[in-house]
Amino acid sequence: MAFVYILECADGTLYTGWTTDLAQRLAAHNAGRGSRYTRGRRPLRLAYWEEHPTPRQARRREAALRRLRRAEKLSLIASNPNEEGV
């Protein structure tokens, strides 16, 4: 099982990533052990996530989400069926 996620950073930017352990990855991002991009943009809020059966599928979906425009990502976040978070 793997997850694709979008984080909303403190400065309003969006970060897209994938992981096999969503709760652990979110904690790592918020502790400054995540990606270089998110380290200086804490705190981070999990705005959107999807579950995929394999890491390969999650990576492909991540690549597709990264190509979206900001407005398209915000629309996806607004329609989030997983609003309750992790």
How would you label these PLM feature ranges?
Residues M1-V86:
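GIY-YIG nuclease catalytic motif and its immediate N-terminal context
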